[in-house]
């Protein structure tokens, strides 16, 4: 009895519906497919009780029991059976080769969508092993699947015997477990592979030709074997015994039918089954998601490894249930969890045989042991449409499976069930086991409205973790081929390490003396490679077998940082292509192709190349004239000094003695050695004070004592890039006429560099004694060569009014002074007013006495230069930072005391006596774009005009003119305070440029674009960003502020407008006078910083 609480099965619902008769024009409905046993019994008009009939009844008995007049379709069955008995070759005029290609006719208006059919699999050579194609059950229906923790079918069925009735009395309405098929194996013989049942409604809707074409591939094998010798029939039966037949019916039943106990006709079973029909059982299994295995045996070997049979018990004590009779199927479904074996199986999986019956070991169907098995021609599960919320469907089993790899090659691989451990489907949730269908893993609730259909694919991905997929097989073949190629000169040890590195060819460090590209010694690799030239490296690589290694780039590899390569190779890191090609050609044992012509002497190119380099090295230390090396281009002035040092050190190391160089090369090497020993700039420590008589390390005497000469001054720290005529102390021409500038003449206002006066000029202080720090890099350096009175007597210059002295330093004394020779007296504005005319031009010395008379600090004891252009090229002021004394040449006051001037001296004749040609480093230093930009944002007229001929630049402030004049002579006195920075040597001509540069070292970018958020260190960089293509949108949405008249703002105006501080709080940068070299230790005033910022 069925449980009243349990939902009715799918078949029970359709069994209560009235039988619908199909017309001649429509296809059969689902009621014809669910043709119940009760209706079949009533249609036969039999008064006998409804019992299962044995299969040994003859066809004639069935015909007598049937009444053909009650169903018009019986005549079609009789005609079909008569056609089969006529010889099986031709059925109703159609040949056997007319195989079925499509599924049964389907009517979308009447037939149910739950029926899933699949086209028949392609036959091998058209037919099967015995001349027939495979049955549809072997194609569609998947393996046995069980649900864990569910009771199995309690009823069991013994094998059918000859003349015995079945003890099975399960009626259609008494199905207890809808999860399992209620149809038990009726025990067809090993040769009965035909269709056992055909719905009656189907035959009524098909003509004879269609029926014969669809039935022909599934005929009984026994009929086809009639007329053959008994030995051949027995041989065919034995061939079928060792295959998949025993997987579905069990070994005992198969042996019984093989001995003749269970011989039956498939068509007889189809017409005479009184209980639940096989087709209904197969239909119920199709619409379920458990994919029970088909009852029909297969004629082909299984492509999958054997799987162990679980819970094997002797057949003599307990009859095999349907689950135990089918230990494995042709294609395991990914939904089905395999049962773990309790006992170790033998090499061949067999069922426990009955007493006295021989056992037939199952044929090995593993692709590893049976290479002839069809490995890629079977689908892994049949397609099916699944409605998860159907009451007859069981729960979806989502437990993943794993393979046990500890078994042997021919031993069964037991598949253990593991909860939630990987797999292709979500892990099972024990809390959702009471739900039906896909409720456990479906995003739609079980009772939700709408369709819930799950399509089970015909070929799901499976076996990925078991190594039986297509991709795994390809990987195994590729790995085997790669391992075979590695066996050879590399040896087994290296091959093992290669496999351990997952295919990467990483040799052991002990196998070669040279570092390789993928070796771990990456740091010292470039250093080790410097000992050999390129050809020697290629030859060494060839000895190690690197020519055959196609996975690496031949040649040395070194870190990219130049500092890691201490000394470059003597060949200047050159790459010889011919030597490289010769190395590659020598590594290949094969001769060159016949169509490639070898150049004469091509093989000896590397040897010749190496001999040439060796001869060049040997010639460095020899005394022959022909072996003297030519001048290395890298030793010429203007080249990078580090390369010359490296070359000279390399020559010294290789030859053991200093190379014989010409005086110019030796002179440059001495300069570079002195540069290496220079003092680093330290802004945290005050500069030391030297007593009189000591040599300051920043003076030119210090460098002259080391053999350095002034023309290398641009490469020395603390000096300026001044011309030779203004920085030379030695090798100066003898006394001659006094050279003086002619810039102050009334007729011409030129900026001219004075000529040299005396070679023996020595610095003397008016206070007596040597000046402690009056060398290069100190204020006042170079003043004696700028004085126009160097060759004059005391009486000639006694009455000259030398201007005023300043009590405060100029704001740019911090990095070397103003360069104007301004004394310690009045302010810079007063001085500029005294030397500048109304039109902005510089006044001649004859007219400056009247303009200087109003100076509040004017004194007869003060001495200054008569022209502002006298010491523009110098780096310092005329006065020291700690002494009011001024240095003047000894020739001015040869042993005479200081005499205060009484009357002004008219020196205009000095400028008319001698005029020298203009000598400036650069005549034009301002670009057109800079001049236009400066003029466009200028609010006042430029009253300060550059005196250099051809320049014509004007400025509104005096310190802008001073910086501009430094640019003419390529002076850059303002150095970056960060060691290692190129600007620490090159410097800047303007102090605000230097401060703005040092903001980059501190990571401060004060000018930010409000549109995109980019930051810039300079306002002009922000302006260029707005003019670029990327910043056009920013310029439209967030334009830069302008002045009231529409002119663009300068940096100082922009900072004031935005409230930007030049030195943000917390930056820790202290620009004091100590850092600038003044030594006073006082912070610079806020006024001077802001004034220099413009």
Swiss-Prot record:
Zinc finger (C2H2-type) stretch: 944-968, 1007-1029
Inactivation phenotype: Decreases virulence in a mouse intranasal inhalation model and intravenous model for infection. Decreases virulence in a moth model. Decreases urease activity. Decreases levels of: laccase and melanin. Hypercapsular with mucoid colony morphology. Sensitive to: calcium; lithium; sodium nitrite; high temperature; sodium dodecyl sulfate (cell wall stress inducer); Calcofluor White (cell wall stress inducer); Congo Red (cell wall stress inducer); caspofungin (cell wall stress inducer). Abolishes filamentation during growth on glucosamine carbon source.
PTM field: Phosphorylated. Dephosphorylated by calcineurin (CNA1) which promotes nuclear localization.
GO terms for biological process, alphabetical: calcineurin-mediated signaling; positive regulation of transcription by RNA polymerase II; positive regulation of transepithelial migration of symbiont in host; regulation of fungal-type cell wall organization
Induction trigger: Induced during glucose starvation.
Residue stretches of biased makeup (Low complexity): 148-159, 228-241, 252-262, 325-342, 477-493, 858-881
SMART domains referenced in this protein's UniProt entry, alphabetically: ZnF_C2H2
Residue ranges of the region described as Disordered: 1-29, 44-81, 93-428, 477-519, 835-888, 1037-1094
Keyword Translocase: no
Pfam families from the UniProt entry: zf-C2H2 (PF00096)
Chief location: cytoplasm
The entry's keywords: Activator, Cytoplasm, DNA-binding, Metal-binding, Nucleus, Phosphoprotein, Repeat, Transcription, Transcription regulation, Virulence, Zinc, Zinc-finger
GO cellular component, one term: nucleus
Name this protein carries in UniProt: Transcriptional regulator CRZ1
Biological source species: Cryptococcus neoformans var. grubii serotype A (strain H99 / ATCC 208821 / CBS 10515 / FGSC 9487)
Taxon lineage: Eukaryota, Fungi, Dikarya, Basidiomycota, Agaricomycotina
